[in-house]
Amino acid sequence: MEIIPAIDLKQSKAVRLTKGDMQTAKIYSDKPWELAKEFEDLGAKWLHIVDLDGAFAGDAINLKTIEKIVSTTNLQVEVGGGIRTKERIKSYLNSGVSRIILGSIALKNPEFVKEVAKNYRVVVGIDAIDGFVAIEGWANVSKMQASNLAKLYADAGVEAIIATDISRDGMLNGVNVEFSASIAKASGIDTIASGGVKDINDIKCLKLNGNIAGVIVGKAYYEGKLDLKEAFKSNF
């Protein structure tokens, strides 16, 4: 199971939010490329980046910072946040990003996502509140059940689904294993759990579930609750 550290970017700084609320942004580094190098030195192979400004603006607001992160490390990088066009996908991939996370557009335009998944490395981000998909920086909650959206992508050729329980995000109160497992079951493809990881025991619980391919960790590391070096050595 892949452990994937996360960097959320707001005005080129590494921040963490609570339940996706931009007003709760806490800055952890004004040099996120150094933070990325730190993750690499601890043993990470992947890095999860969200352009928070981009998620609301629908543009690559933090592209230059992401380019610097990519050039500073040998990490495989996945990026999400306001990516809605082929041109934007190409610009990220041309910058050295490994794969693209498509969130809001995965609900609004599934055919577009299925089309680009034929030619590019795509991950679908499904963010949910009480089981229903939230989009546009989590500002709007739809009537689509997360598990039903996951089913749409069962045979679409996407690499994975990132399943985020927004109610747990940044709360350090434990990952929602059942939610992630339900997405994995509905889609039949690799599912990465996100939101609420508080310590290494959460990672162990996900591993025991058996069908979770990865986990994204953020605030637990930043707040000193999770020893990433130990986690990587544990060979989950």
From Swiss-Prot:
Give compartment(s): Cytoplasm
State the source organism's domain of life.
Answer: Bacteria
Alphabetical keyword list: Amino-acid biosynthesis, Cytoplasm, Histidine biosynthesis, Isomerase
Major subcellular site: cytoplasm
Gene Ontology cellular-component terms for this entry are:
cytoplasm
Please name the Pfam families in this protein's record: His_biosynth
Q: CDD domains attached here?
A: HisA (cd04732)
Q: In which pathway does it act?
A: Amino-acid biosynthesis; L-histidine biosynthesis; L-histidine from 5-phospho-alpha-D-ribose 1-diphosphate: step 4/9
Which residues are annotated as active site? D8, D127
Q: Tell me one GO biological process term.
A: L-histidine biosynthetic process
Per UniProt, what is one GO molecular function of this protein?
1-(5-phosphoribosyl)-5-[(5-phosphoribosylamino)methylideneamino]imidazole-4-carboxamide isomerase activity
Q: Which InterPro entries match?
A: Aldolase_TIM, His_biosynth, HisA_bact_arch, Isoase_HisA-like, Isoase_HisA-like_bact, RibuloseP-bd_barrel
Q: What is this protein called?
A: 1-(5-phosphoribosyl)-5-[(5-phosphoribosylamino)methylideneamino] imidazole-4-carboxamide isomerase
Which organism is this entry from?
A: Campylobacter fetus subsp. fetus (strain 82-40)
